[in-house]
């Protein structure tokens, strides 16, 4: 599982998965990212006045992930992985989902409290075909996210439910939503 992280090294995520008795997996945590620039699919204003804008450089990070990070990580494994997943929290959750429309290398995806409020993303997803349909998809959204006064972000619940419906329409065989 490839996991962009804003802080830490992903060990908390891995340990939590072990506590939940998840089957064994390899976790590749990717840090050092300029979150708003490298995980946003296109440019847009920040979420509040005078906030850092979103840079729209996700394609560049995805290219680095596909051409450098994945080959390097998987070359150290004793055998090729049985499946490959991409996961993320917040803006990285948006990136994980967006990646499904860009490449067919991920069979599984998880978006935890994904920034599905991102302007134009749900329409983008509806209007295009995924490069490959994942075998497993997970969506979650915390209760606090739905109560934000921020105009840009306040429809995140509707957008997460819209993505859930899109997964149903696209016949993703194993999907789980905690919304």
Give the role of each language-model region.
Residues 32, 110-118, 142-145:
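Active-site nucleophile loop of the alpha/beta-hydrolase fold
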Residues 1-64, 68-76:
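Serine-hydrolase catalytic machinery in alpha/beta-hydrolase-like enzymes
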Residues 98-108:
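Conserved hydrolase catalytic core segment
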Residues 178:
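Conserved small/polar residues in nucleotide/adenosyl-binding loops
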Residues 83-88, 112:
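Short beta-strand immediately N-terminal to the catalytic nucleophile in serine-hydrolase-like folds
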Residues 134-146:
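Catalytic His-Asp charge-relay segment
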Residues 87-92, 96:
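Gly/Ala-rich beta-loop-alpha elbow adjacent to hydrolase catalytic centers
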Residues 143-174:
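Active-site-adjacent alpha-helix of alpha/beta-hydrolase-fold enzymes
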């Amino acid at each position: 599982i490839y996991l962009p992280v804003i802080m830490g090294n992903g060990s908390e995520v891995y340990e939590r998965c072990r506590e939940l008795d998840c089957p064994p997996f390899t976790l590749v945590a990717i840090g050092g990212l300029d979150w708003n620039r490298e995980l946003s699919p296109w440019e847009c204003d920040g979420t509040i006045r005078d906030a850092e804008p979103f840079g729209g450089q996700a394609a560049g990070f995805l290219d680095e992930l596909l051409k450098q990070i994945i080959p390097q990580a998987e070359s150290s494994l004793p055998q090729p992985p049985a499946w490959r997943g991409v996961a993320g929290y917040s803006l990285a959750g948006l990136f994980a989902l967006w990646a499904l429309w860009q490449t067919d290398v991920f069979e599984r995806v998880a978006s935890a409290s994904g920034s599905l409020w991102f302007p134009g993303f749900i329409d983008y997803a509806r209007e295009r075909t995924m490069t490959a349909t994942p075998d497993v998809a997970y969506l979650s959204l915390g209760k606090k996210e739905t109560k934000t006064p921020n105009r840009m972000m306040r429809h995140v619940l509707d957008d997460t439910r819209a993505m859930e419906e899109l997964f149903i329409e696209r016949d993703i065989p194993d999907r789980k939503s905690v919304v």
